[in-house]
């Protein structure tokens, strides 16, 4: 039975994550869908009229909850590089091929999200007049497909910080066992979701930014899994 699953897990659907991403973009990027209302509704949970639930400079708390998860991802990436360079000294359940896939996928997801931010021209909640931003760095909230004035920010969509956490969705494509794949989905969603929620509570992102990031991570990981086929190898490959 294990072998019969290999062809399927090495050909994960790219249509489904692409459709989910398109749905998110359409729902939040167009007027009249309710997406803009939902974004503002979620932000209202963290905005008290004068500041965000988590201030921009939260001292040690920020270092722990913002830098901590990033440090964990860096350590994981270093571990993957070790497994790639020294597979004989690495856990047998990982193997070089899976380590290469995970490293490449995580890097590609983070790079894709950060590069897209430069062209989508979306502002963070902190940069909006409605949330107390002060001129000349104060803007109206414009949706993805709205025409933007010169100088409009382009540093929010998709979410860069959460992309590192959602990149762990790659774990779901590295093994063929259903229970392990489910574990990968949970790890990626929880890690990325926590990182995204923290940024929402700081006024650095809307819900839409975070959801789009998760969908992009899913799509990129699926594309790379079809190409690299990490699940179609033995535990020690």
Where are the predicted features?
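Alpha-helical transmembrane spans of integral membrane proteins, capturing the lipid-embedded, hydrophobic core
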Residues: 71, 75-76, 102-111, 214, ...
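Membrane-interface loops
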Residues: 95-177
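Aromatic-anchored segments of alpha-helical transmembrane domains
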Residues: 24-29, 108-114, 190-200
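Cytoplasmic juxtamembrane regions at transmembrane-helix boundaries
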Residues: 80-103, 170-189
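N-terminal transmembrane-helix/juxtamembrane module of multi-pass inner/ER membrane proteins
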Residues: 2-80, 118-125, 135-136
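Alpha-helical membrane-inserting segments
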Residues: 77-81, 112, 116, 220-228
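Membrane-embedded catalytic cores of phosphoryl/pyrophosphoryl-handling enzymes
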Residues: 3-19, 139-237
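Membrane-interfacial segments
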Residues: 85-92, 119-128, 179-180, 227-236
